[in-house]
């Protein structure tokens, strides 16, 4: 049994050693991928019968807890950290840095919220407000996201740019990002465009908790730029920062008054720890 799972644990161990910090969602995804790529047909069913449970969950527990180890070759990532509302697991002998947590958060955000997932929601919203999409494209955030750590483990992240036009004086350049956490890097100059518009909008997905939004609001000034939050499952948009001049946009938000009240409450009542 250990021999059969050895390639799986080797693959997962190499990944853990490379990054040191992995989100729960990404770890579960890598476990699934390793089982699909390393086990032959019939091996998984036989192992699950022998072990009395689903392999994905058994391997996840083997990696992230001290109990129920399936093999001495199982990676050990029992150190658990909550960062910005997401759960992360770290190697116990690894002195993680804040940059590694940030990179792990960005990796998972890009996996679970690719910009394409939100594009149709945004396009439908703009059409309802009377706009036509005249230009769109995928652009890269070509930069070292996390300094020296990211130079060693470089990732390329994409965002989508839309140019929506309603009339000669109503046109918007809209950028769709995988997370609010990417916006500071865009603001630093890595997402410049030749497209000129009278207003900029950044659309980001919802998060598990308000923490990433509160951190962003407290640490960054976006000037005249608006930020909208998209709920992919409900196919809705609501404002986070800024008030649109076009009443047709305002009237198509799902619940703008409630969204703005929530932002006000977050700012007054919640404290975000520094990492």
Predicted regions and their residues:
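Acidic-basic catalytic patches of nuclease active cores, encompassing PD-(D/E)XK
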Residues: 2-20, 25-71, 75-86, 91-159, ...
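A sequence-composition feature that detects small, non-aromatic residues
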Residues: 16-17, 99, 104, 110, ...
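Charged, structured surface patches that assemble and position nucleic-acid processing machinery
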Residues: 154-156, 171-173, 178-183, 192-275
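Conserved mixed alpha/beta catalytic, RNA-binding, or beta-rich assembly cores of soluble enzyme
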Residues: 188-189
